[in-house]
Amino acid sequence: MSSHQQKQPCTAPPQLHEQQVKQPCQPPPPEPCVSQVKTPCDTKVPEPCHPKAPEPCHPKAPEPCHPKAPEPCHPKAPEPCHPKAPEPCHPKAPEPCHPKAPEPCHPKAPEPCHPKVPEPCLPKAPEPCQPIVPEPCPSTVTPILAQQKTKQK
């Protein structure tokens, strides 16, 4: 009776050929049986080994090492180092550096740069324009000079 019930739900949902549905339904049962036998074996072997080995090792090694090494080292090394090194370094380095570096840099860079760029640009533009305009002017002046010369004669 149970075999009939299994075939009905398998053939109903897929709507594929009955032969194709029957084939995949039959091979799966033996596969899970093999994996089920392997899983209990794997879990039984590692379970007792893992908890027994790491549990006693971790608490015994790190517990005594951490409190003994860092406790005496931290208070002895950082206490004398911090006040001796940073105290004399901070006031000596930043004080003379700040006024010397930014003060001369600001006036030297912007002052010469601004007047040099706009000054040569302005005279360069009108210069070529002036010689072009006066060229036709001399031609108009020549006839005037000729008239003056004729009058003098």
UniProtKB/Swiss-Prot annotation:
GO MF: structural constituent of cytoskeleton
Location within or outside the cell: Cytoplasm
Region (14 X 8 AA approximate tandem repeats): 27-138
GO process annotations (BP): keratinization; regulation of cell shape
Major localisation: cytoplasm
Extent of the signal sequence: none
Lineage top rank: taxon: Eukaryota
Tissues where this protein is expressed: Expressed in fetal periderm, hair follicles and in the thickened epidermis of the lip and footpad. Also present in the epithelia of various tissues such as the penis, vagina, forestomach, tongue and esophagus.
Gene Ontology terms: cellular component: cornified envelope; cytoplasm
Pfam families assigned to the protein according to its UniProt record, in alphabetical order: Cornifin
Keyword terms: Cytoplasm, Keratinization, Repeat
Spans of repeat Sequence: 27-34, 35-42, 43-50, 51-58, 59-66, 67-74, 75-82, 83-90, 91-98, 99-106, 107-114, 115-122, 123-130, 131-138
Region (Disordered): 1-35, 49-85
Entry's family note: Belongs to the cornifin (SPRR) family.
Function: Cross-linked envelope protein of keratinocytes. It is a keratinocyte protein that first appears in the cell cytosol, but ultimately becomes cross-linked to membrane proteins by transglutaminase. All that results in the formation of an insoluble envelope beneath the plasma membrane.
Listed name of the protein: Cornifin-B
Gene: Sprr1b
